[in-house]
Amino acid sequence: MLKKIVYKKLFGVFDYEINLKEDGVTIITGPNGFGKSTILKSIDAFYSFNIIFFSRLDYEKISFFSVEGKEPISIEKKGQKIIINGFEINVNDFQDEILRKFRRPYYYRIDESRWIDRRTDEIISEDDLIQEYISSRYMDGEIGIQNTEFQNYIQNILQWQF
């Protein structure tokens, strides 16, 4: 379960330390545009391992702390790289390779970032593909990182509960 979340330079401006109550509700208040909804979305993105969300958000570092006292999981953004406890992920490196997959005749582009698979009528977004590609590449160990450590990291997140 999450105990605390620390944001450094959310939207390039705000530094927050949010302590979450174990036995109750934590209320987040503030003026419009100060990040309340973004904080909730970042918690969801953390638990669903949504790298795309973190690649598009404006921040320097977000740290998630567990009640179990485990080492916090820190997500940093440096240019086009997302660094999760030392593991570097460059989302832009994957986009070209993913888009090459859509040059097959059964994919039809329906707008700037969505395609339809004519075989199944499934609509596929670019974000979904990038997320799937990142997860499969890192989990399969096809990139030059230590796959076992990354799998342990994923397991650690999955064991955390709301």
Can you say where each PLM-predicted feature lies in the sequence?
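Conserved A-loop
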Residues: 17-20
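Phosphate-binding glycine-rich loops of NTP-binding sites
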Residues: 22-62, 66-69, 74, 80
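N-terminal pre-Walker A segment at the start of P-loop NTPase domains
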Residues: 1-14
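Electropositive, glycine-dotted interaction segments
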Residues: 80-162
